[in-house]
Amino acid sequence: MALELLTPFTKVELEEEKKESNRKQIGILGGNFNPIHNAHLVVADQVRQQLGLDQVLLMPECKPPHVDAKETIDEKHRLRMLELAIEDVEGLAIETCELERQGISYTYDTMLYLTEQHPDVDFYFIIGADMVDYLPKWHRIDELVKLVQFVGVQRPKYKAGTSYPVIWVDLPLMDISSSMIRDFIKKGRQPNYLLPKRVLDYITQEGLYQ
């Protein structure tokens, strides 16, 4: 069965709501993860802690509708880098349903599947503040907001407004991107401290992004 729409609670109201419920609270951070980097991990961990979620799932996309497929490496590498990145990390796991389904990854289709598979879970879909502005353009957005509670990661000095229910989480600015890391590697520069060392070692070993 589908989840009921959650209103845009404050964090305190959210905690009170969870105390009265036996349902699991699971966050989802989707992305191309090409490659995963430290900012991804900080977002996932801080949202989990600040909202008191049971777990956050990192969900690699198969064919995101907004990403150039030519820039995306094979999914086996992206998945392996995710596995390496969260080894021994509490509260983070991987959801592979979009990779298994193949095709274009629309959030509505994914969340409809997940809510049907896990009717005892409330899902929190994590997006950046810049993506909040684009919610009206998301595929089947009016139906999607009935399946998930959106969580917006607020950037310093960035003011996003939306009529859709969003819980806001404040995080320090981390100006790290996957494209930056790929560019470093292409130019022969080591992106030290921008991503987990195990992930960087894997990239070097496999000769990725050369």
UniProtKB/Swiss-Prot annotation:
Highest taxon of source: Bacteria
GO MF annotations, alphabetized: ATP binding; nicotinate-nucleotide adenylyltransferase activity
Keywords, sorted A to Z: ATP-binding, NAD, Nucleotide-binding, Nucleotidyltransferase, Pyridine nucleotide biosynthesis, Transferase
Key word Flavoprotein present: no
Catalytic activity: nicotinate beta-D-ribonucleotide + ATP + H(+) = deamido-NAD(+) + diphosphate
Pathway the protein acts in: Cofactor biosynthesis; NAD(+) biosynthesis; deamido-NAD(+) from nicotinate D-ribonucleotide: step 1/1
InterPro entries per record: Cyt_trans-like, NadD/NMNAT, Rossmann-like_a/b/a_fold
SUPFAM superfamilies: Nucleotidylyl transferase (SSF52374)
CDD domains: NMNAT (cd02165)
EC number: 2.7.7.18
UniProt xrefs under HAMAP family: NaMN_adenylyltr
Entry-linked PANTHER family: NICOTINATE-NUCLEOTIDE ADENYLYLTRANSFERASE-RELATED, PHOSPHOPANTETHEINE ADENYLYLTRANSFERASE
Function: Catalyzes the reversible adenylation of nicotinate mononucleotide (NaMN) to nicotinic acid adenine dinucleotide (NaAD).
Protein family according to the UniProt entry: Belongs to the NadD family.
Designated name of the protein: Probable nicotinate-nucleotide adenylyltransferase
Organism: Streptococcus pyogenes serotype M3 (strain ATCC BAA-595 / MGAS315)
Gene (name only): nadD
